[in-house]
């Protein structure tokens, strides 16, 4: 299992939202590159980036920051937020060279487009972000609640050929109250998808719980920024345990 630190980008800054609310944000740094470099120094291999402006508006707004992080670190980057057409996907994967892109709104609204990307780029480079609010999938930067029950949607993704999903319980995100492990256990039981846990991580016990359940990965954001988790210690522990993210 891989521990994946997160940087959420808005207006060129590293921020965190509370339960996906754009009006409830905390700015942690005006220099996201420095944070990424610090993650790498601590032992991170992967980095989870979210373009919050892109997620809300449907167009990339933090491109140069992503490019700088890619050029000035050796981190393997996954990026989501506003990736809704082939031009944006090719920009990230082919020009900037990130390892994988995360589709959210596009996956829910345009399954044929998702299939096209899976064929063109392969299963390892296309990840689907499934954001859940009150049992249903949310889109457009968590602002729009659909009528798609999350489990039905996940099973549809599996049928299409998706391999990896990042699942976020929006009610947990940014709360430091622990992930909704009942949700993740259910998904693992009902599908064969590789599940990355996201939202609500509070301390190292959540990382251990995810590892014990053999989840594919876990994303750590606010818990690090608020000093609840020593990531360097966690990376060292994970390396000794040999939990690689393939």
UniProtKB/Swiss-Prot annotation:
GO biological process annotation, one example: L-histidine biosynthetic process
CDD domains: HisA
InterPro entries given in the database record: Aldolase_TIM, His_biosynth, HisA_bact_arch, Isoase_HisA-like, Isoase_HisA-like_bact, RibuloseP-bd_barrel
Source organism per UniProt: Lactococcus lactis subsp. cremoris (strain SK11)
Catalytic residues (positions): 8 (proton acceptor), 131 (proton donor)
Enzyme Commission number(s): 5.3.1.16
Keyword line: Amino-acid biosynthesis, Cytoplasm, Histidine biosynthesis, Isomerase
Pathway: Amino-acid biosynthesis; L-histidine biosynthesis; L-histidine from 5-phospho-alpha-D-ribose 1-diphosphate: step 4/9
Domain of life: Bacteria
GO molecular function: 1-(5-phosphoribosyl)-5-[(5-phosphoribosylamino)methylideneamino]imidazole-4-carboxamide isomerase activity
Keyword NADP: no
Source lineage: Bacteria, Bacillati, Bacillota, Bacilli, Lactobacillales
Sequence similarity: Belongs to the HisA/HisF family.
Annotated NCBIfam families: 1-(5-phosphoribosyl)-5-[(5-phosphoribosylamino)methylideneamino]imidazole-4-carboxamide isomerase
Protein name as catalogued: 1-(5-phosphoribosyl)-5-[(5-phosphoribosylamino)methylideneamino] imidazole-4-carboxamide isomerase
PANTHER family: 1-(5-PHOSPHORIBOSYL)-5-[(5-PHOSPHORIBOSYLAMINO)METHYLIDENEAMINO] IMIDAZOLE-4-CARBOXAMIDE ISOMERASE
């Amino acid at each position: 299992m891989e521990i994946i630190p997160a940087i959420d980008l808005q207006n060129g800054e590293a921020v965190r939202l509370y339960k996906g609310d754009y009006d409830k944000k905390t700015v942690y740094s005006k220099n996201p590159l420095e944070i990424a470099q610090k993650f790498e120094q601590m032992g991170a291999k992967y980095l989870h980036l979210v373009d919050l402006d892109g997620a809300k508006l449907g167009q990339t707004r933090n491109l140069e920051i992503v490019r700088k992080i890619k050029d000035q670190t050796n981190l393997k980057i996954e990026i989501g937020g506003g990736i809704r057409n082939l031009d944006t996907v090719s920009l990230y994967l082919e020009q900037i060279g990130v390892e994988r892109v995360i589709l959210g709104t596009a996956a829910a609204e345009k399954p044929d487009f998702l299939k096209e990307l899976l064929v063109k780029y392969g299963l390892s480079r296309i990840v689907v972000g499934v954001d859940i609010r009150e049992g249903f999938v949310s889109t457009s930067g968590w602002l729009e609640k659909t009528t798609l029950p999350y489990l039905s949607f996940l099973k549809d993704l599996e049928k299409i050929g998706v391999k990896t999903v990042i699942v976020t319980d929006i009610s947990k995100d940014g709360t430091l109250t622990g992930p909704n492990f009942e949700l993740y256990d259910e998904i693992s039981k009902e599908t064969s998808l590789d599940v990355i846990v996201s939202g609500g991580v509070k301390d190292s016990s959540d990382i251990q719980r995810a590892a014990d359940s053999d989840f594919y990965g876990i994303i750590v954001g606010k818990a690090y920024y608020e000093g609840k988790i020593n990531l360097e210690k966690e990376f060292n522990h994970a390396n000794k345990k040999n939990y690689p993210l393939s």
